[in-house]
Amino acid sequence: MSVAKVDDNRKVTTHRLIEMKQRGEKISMLTAYDYSMAKLIDQAGMDVILVGDSASNVMAGNVTTLPITLDQMIYHGKSVMKAVNRALVVVDLPFGTYQGNSKEALASAIRVMKETHADCIKLEGGAEVRESIERILCAGIPIMGHLGLTPQSINKFGTYTVRAREEAEAKKLIEDAHLLEEIGCFALVLEKIPAELAARVASELTIPVIGIGAGGGVDGQVLVMHDMLGINQGFSPRFLRRYANLGEEITRAVQAYIEDVKSQDFPNEKEQY
């Protein structure tokens, strides 16, 4: 497998993502939640790093994204920002911090921006959270939208199945996508929707559309780091491509360490002072 060379070390900005869409350059996006992994991902040349509320699942062991708090998201965001020089860093607003009212939404977004120094925030939903989005945007905070399968609404959906297969839901998604662009979102994530629908949305919008389980006709792709590196071994949806099996490698390394300690092979003479 060839390794992409990073020729441009300039800081990635929201405007630069739009330029990438205009010239047909695909956008790479991956999650990170801590300093060490964020540093490696940034040095590898990732365009966008998402401090996702998926930390609730892969870092804290929760079944859904719902339990993670704003304080916890800020902790992860601060850790990532200390490591990143090039990538655009997006921090998710967690469940319950923007759905209630626009004043609460703005306060949440301001806390994230002030305390993490992130570049922008991401939130889920369309017309139903319009007021919150507009109020945050009026404060000069860039927003990435998120439509399709929105994990914070899992109790409403009841399942993580593909969304917008039916005509009515697809129509609403298209309307919401145009609305998010119209009111000022700089980019949009589409999760787990039919590839044809996602490609249509990407072609109709001027802002970048980044997909996860949304086919190849969008402007970029995002995956959860633990999934694509094979750390989260129990998760294997159709859209996921594994680029490593670190779960197996870590297990082997730990077992080798245990054996060396038990057998007194570690430390040897060269590993002592």
From Swiss-Prot:
Cofactor binding summary note: Binds 1 Mg(2+) ion per subunit.
GO biological-process terms attached to the record: pantothenate biosynthetic process
Subcellular location: Cytoplasm
Catalytic activity: 3-methyl-2-oxobutanoate + (6R)-5,10-methylene-5,6,7,8-tetrahydrofolate + H2O = 2-dehydropantoate + (6S)-5,6,7,8-tetrahydrofolate
Keywords: Cytoplasm, Magnesium, Metal-binding, Pantothenate biosynthesis, Transferase
SUPFAM superfamilies: Phosphoenolpyruvate/pyruvate domain (SSF51621)
GO molecular function per UniProt: 3-methyl-2-oxobutanoate hydroxymethyltransferase activity; magnesium ion binding
Active site: 191
Gene3D superfamilies for the chain: Phosphoenolpyruvate-binding domains
Obligatory cofactor(s): Mg(2+)
EC numbers on record: 2.1.2.11
GO cellular component, one term: cytoplasm
UniProt-listed Pfam families: Pantoate_transf
Residues holding 3-methyl-2-oxobutanoate: 53-54, 92, 122
InterPro entries, per the entry: Pantoate_hydroxy_MeTrfase (IPR003700), Pyrv/PenolPyrv_kinase-like_dom (IPR015813), Pyrv_kinase-like_dom_sf (IPR040442)
Family according to the record: Belongs to the PanB family.
Assembly, per entry: Homodecamer; pentamer of dimers.
Protein name listed in UniProt: 3-methyl-2-oxobutanoate hydroxymethyltransferase
